Amino acid sequence: MQDFLPFSKPAIGDAEISAVCEVLKSGWITTGPKSHELEQQFCDTYGCQHAVALNSATAGMHVTLMALGIGPGDEVITPSQTWVSTINLITLLGAEPVFVDVDRDTLMTSAELIAPLITVNTKAIIPVHYAGAPVDLDPILKLARQYDIPVIEDAAHAIGTRYRDRWIGATGTAIFSFHAIKNLTCAEGGMLVTDDKALADKVRMLKFHGLGVDAFDRMTLGSKPQAEVITPGFKYNLTDINAAIALIQLARLPELNARRAGLVARYQEKLAGLPLAPLAIPTYPHLHAWHLFMVRVDPERCGLDRDQLMQALQERGIGTGLHFRAAHTQKYYRERYPALSLPHTEWNSSRLCTLPLFPDMTLADVDRVVAALTDILE
């Protein structure tokens, strides 16, 4: 019996373990020098002007929406084909999520789909870079500038992704995730990057109780022990334990993403004869980070549905994922927006299946997955 092959596994090595031990022995384990170093390294690597480390991308989205003043009566345009946290945050702030459909084959939205949804109440647009590929950003930014609407890029899948001639995050405002399955992980964590200093300053306050400085700043700068609360805030800071892991992962990322690309090339070659439909690759210039490798399982072509395929793979010791069930099909949002129709989103939501992909996989692992798929489908 072969070992179970998960759909994802973090690439943690001796360097990450040593970095954590170093922090544990340092006497400073919460937000401190490593967190600050991570922010600087992120800016140096991707050309960002400001970077704010947080304990999750969800936290980053929360404080960014708050910093932009999003609240009751406001509308935020975003795909339903995304992780539900963004929709939850818009809703919890009292604003209205305005769901935009996506391209049927890339799962990404576009300026053409967004434009008809803009109203006088639109206060933000949140496009999603999907599975490691970049959304076609320039037309969306041009549209947003016409209406003076902020754009927040959901870059949870896009660390190490390039769009045309630049890294995702090099300009504008974007939020990255360091969750356990992401290309760069520190178990839990995130990073807001922006070229808007005022926004970065607000996010820094909101992420740490509304104080103008964090605990390490107060110690190293000799500030008064009790800092001033500028505005009510949260506790969303990233610890140095997490940041130490992220620093090693950031240095390793080109190598890790290259491994992903090699595995995907094998998948693409071996799956060519099967009736599964991988996502389409964007035609504009880009560098794909290959966060996820996804196929669509169409019952008419495959002879079984997505859930049956996932179960059959599970029985053969192979894990899969679902990224994602569309947010508007979840119970709360389904009942709140019963008349909403997003044809491309809904078609994909019922057919998407994420196959195993992580840097420590081997080509033999890919061949095993393809052999299982061939056995199931034939």
Curated annotation (Swiss-Prot):
Listed EC numbers: 2.6.1.87
GO annotation (BP), single: lipid A biosynthetic process
Pathway listed: Nucleotide-sugar biosynthesis; UDP-4-deoxy-4-formamido-beta-L-arabinose biosynthesis; UDP-4-deoxy-4-formamido-beta-L-arabinose from UDP-alpha-D-glucuronate: step 2/3; Bacterial outer membrane biogenesis; lipopolysaccharide biosynthesis
CDD domains: AHBA_syn
Sample GO molecular function, one term: UDP-4-amino-4-deoxy-L-arabinose aminotransferase
Modified residues (N6-(pyridoxal phosphate)lysine): 182
Reactions catalysed: UDP-4-amino-4-deoxy-beta-L-arabinose + 2-oxoglutarate = UDP-beta-L-threo-pentopyranos-4-ulose + L-glutamate
Gene3D superfamilies on file: Aspartate Aminotransferase, domain 1 (3.90.1150.10), Type I PLP-dependent aspartate aminotransferase-like (Major domain) (3.40.640.10)
Pfam families the UniProt entry points to: DegT_DnrJ_EryC1
InterPro entries for the chain: ArnB_NH2Trfase, DegT/StrS_aminotransferase, PyrdxlP-dep_Trfase, PyrdxlP-dep_Trfase_major, PyrdxlP-dep_Trfase_small
GO cellular component term, pick one: membrane
Alphabetized UniProt keyword annotations: Aminotransferase, Antibiotic resistance, Lipid A biosynthesis, Lipid biosynthesis, Lipid metabolism, Lipopolysaccharide biosynthesis, Pyridoxal phosphate, Transferase
Cofactor(s) required for function per UniProt: pyridoxal 5'-phosphate
Subunit description: Homodimer.
Family designation: Belongs to the DegT/DnrJ/EryC1 family. ArnB subfamily.
Its job: Catalyzes the conversion of UDP-4-keto-arabinose (UDP-Ara4O) to UDP-4-amino-4-deoxy-L-arabinose (UDP-L-Ara4N). The modified arabinose is attached to lipid A and is required for resistance to polymyxin and cationic antimicrobial peptides.
Protein name in UniProt: UDP-4-amino-4-deoxy-L-arabinose--oxoglutarate aminotransferase
